[in-house]
């Protein structure tokens, strides 16, 4: 039986799309199995998000790719619980943190993941074309970079130690990396816990107000099952509403998974009220 990688349909395109995702490229090159897990569309308890993964694990499962917070549903996976189950089977746990890095307080040791990646330009509010990679210290020697450049070393085994093993990528934009440090300093001034508290407050207020309008949500209202991503369920295509949201109300959202709002620390309650008013005005079109 072939080795397998477990992921979900709500992973980012880099992890789940049949065209261009890492697991599917590995499938084409090395013949691994890609197992897609389906989680409940409207979970009411953490266990409902853990069980589908545990049931998908087999003795041939080598890795599980988790999206911490989905940009398609807003669902927040209980990574620590899934990782604990994976660890008993020796399964590598990778976490896509694109929608959690910069939006909540994170302790990667508590999450229990082996690797974690995130882009800098989303909730972290940093530069584009930059991101972060975390590799558990005791796994550095076992993990190979997919691309190397001068500085790697003279043999197949790198001369570099620790994190520098993954930084041998040729010429790079050092100003971009300096901007990452500046952005990290800004987050430190506010405090990760305070950022997470404010994002939860804004997102919860927004979801509750939209639900009170009788407009269905894709995203769970319970903070423990969601993050800052708030997605409104749309009966038809979401792009016309996304364009109207910006043209008529000056609100930049996204059409992925429905009509997506992502309130952050720079938003105020007045902004939330304006978003709710926009949803109310577009309610007939949203409901179809």
Segments predicted by a language model, with ranges:
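Short linear motifs in intrinsically disordered, low-complexity N-terminal regions enriched in Ser/Thr
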Residues: 7-9
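Pyridoxal 5′-phosphate
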Residues: 1-4, 13-288
């Amino acid at each position: 039986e072939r080795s397998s990688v477990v992921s979900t349909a709500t992973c980012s395109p880099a992890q789940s799309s049949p065209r261009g995702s890492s697991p599917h490229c590995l499938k084409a090159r090395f013949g691994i199995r890609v197992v897609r897990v389906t989680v409940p569309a409207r979970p009411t308890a953490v266990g409902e998000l853990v069980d589908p993964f545990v049931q998908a694990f087999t003795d041939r499962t080598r890795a599980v790719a988790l999206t911490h917070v989905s940009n398609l549903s807003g669902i927040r996976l209980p990574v620590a619980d899934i990782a604990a189950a994976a660890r008993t089977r020796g399964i590598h746990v990778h976490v896509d943190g694109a929608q959690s890095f910069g939006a909540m307080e994170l302790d990667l040791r508590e999450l229990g993941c082996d690797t974690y990646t995130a882009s800098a330009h989303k909730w972290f509010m940093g530069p584009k074309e930059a991101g972060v990679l975390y590799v558990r210290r005791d796994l550095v020697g076992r993990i190979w970079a997919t691309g190397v450049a001068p500085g790697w070393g003279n043999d197949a085994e790198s001369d570099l130690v620790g994190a520098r093993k993954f930084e041998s990528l040729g010429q790079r934009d050092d100003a971009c990396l300096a901007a990452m440090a500046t952005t990290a300093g800004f987050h430190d001034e506010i405090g990760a816990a305070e950022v997470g508290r404010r994002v939860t407050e804004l997102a919860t207020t927004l979801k509750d107000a939209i639900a009170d309008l009788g407009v269905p949500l894709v995203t769970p209202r319970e903070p423990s099952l969601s993050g800052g991503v708030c997605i409104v369920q749309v009966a038809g295509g979401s792009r016309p509403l996304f364009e109207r949201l910006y043209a008529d109300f000056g609100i930049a959202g996204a059409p992925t998974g429905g009509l997506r709002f992502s309130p952050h620390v720079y938003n105020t309650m007045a902004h939330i009220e304006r978003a709710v008013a926009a949803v109310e005005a577009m309610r007939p079109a949203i409901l179809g």
